Amino acid sequence: MARPVRVVVLGAGSWGTTVAGLAAHNTPTLLWARNSDTADEINNEHRNSRYLGDRPLPDSMRSTADLVEAAHEADVLVVGVPSHAVRSTLAQIANEVRAWVPVLSLAKGLEPGTRLRPTEVIAECLPGHPVGLLAGPNIAREIVDGLAAASVVATQDVRVATALQPLFASAVFRVYRNTDVLGCELGGVLKNIVAIASGMADGLDVGDNTRAMVLARGLAEMTRLGEAMGANPRTFAGLTGVGDLIATCMSPSSRNRRVGEYIARGMTVDEAVAKLGQVAEGVKTAPTVMELARDYNVEMPIAAEVEAVVAGRQTPEGAYRGLRKVAAGGEHEVA
């Protein structure tokens, strides 16, 4: 009888822990935690109190603080560290991961300086490995609580995606597949910026009509940039596009939405991130996205205002006044 596929997840934040829990219901799973106390808590108490409170984790899920041990065990490697830490983490195990092991990214940001997407960073660090991502409208705590959700495994080789789907699926967690890695990954990156704008709308109490406008026009910006970069525009109408956008902009648990709300209520960006206590990818990503928008000659007025707020050149109130001044042409035109 063939040995079960062993899944290793790097990063014991809320989403990394949740994905490890999903996999642990289907196959042997090991979660690498940077902090040994976190690993001990998962192994002994079957919970990750810092990120998921008292929610129980599968008894079968194991954790380690030894990165090399984790790399040696992987038949499938899932990279759940923040986008700015992907390269430094993988550099430590570049010679430890067996050949041809598929690698999935969970990160939803861009590498500072290089502007590379996480899958591109992974491909540089682990050449020759099939690379993809797992993404969708996934609020970690809801999934751990057993509420229904769906996600997408995106790899260029549909055979790899098909093989990976059942490792994470359950009766209440549907996993679809897609070969548009670029589009799926950009959806996860760009929606964080729109979520900050949505959070600012909440903090300013501008009303549901304005929030709906921000979501709809934000999706248009996401799609325009994605198509200009070579993604399939239809991808942005799916789970990794509009689906992830809605969840991130509407959920009280959304980190990027909360950062936007905190800023609109008078906090500085640093104070908002400190209160959050977790990574809000949109804060780090906004300047890089605007560089891409300029490179590809794509108008992104919402993203531009968010970037200005994050950089301290604009106030949330000024950002919304600026958006009201954007000329309205045909709905499917630029602005």
Swiss-Prot record:
The keyword Magnesium does not apply. Keywords: Cytoplasm, Lipid biosynthesis, Lipid metabolism, NAD, NADP, Nucleotide-binding, Oxidoreductase, Phospholipid biosynthesis, Phospholipid metabolism. The active site is at K191. It is found in: Cytoplasm. Gene3D superfamilies: N-(1-d-carboxylethyl)-l-norvaline Dehydrogenase, domain 2 (1.10.1040.10), NAD(P)-binding Rossmann-like Domain (3.40.50.720). One of its GO terms (cellular component) is cytosol. GO terms for biological process: carbohydrate metabolic process; glycerol-3-phosphate biosynthetic process; glycerol-3-phosphate catabolic process; glycerophospholipid metabolic process; phospholipid biosynthetic process. It comes from the Bacteria. It holds the Pfam family NAD_Gly3P_dh_C. Sn-glycerol 3-phosphate binds at K108, G136, K191, D244, S254, R255, N256. InterPro entries: 6-PGluconate_DH-like_C_sf, 6PGD_dom2, G3P_DH_NAD-dep, G3P_DH_NAD-dep_C, G3P_DH_NAD-dep_N, NAD(P)-bd_dom_sf. This is Glycerol-3-phosphate dehydrogenase [NAD(P)+] 1.
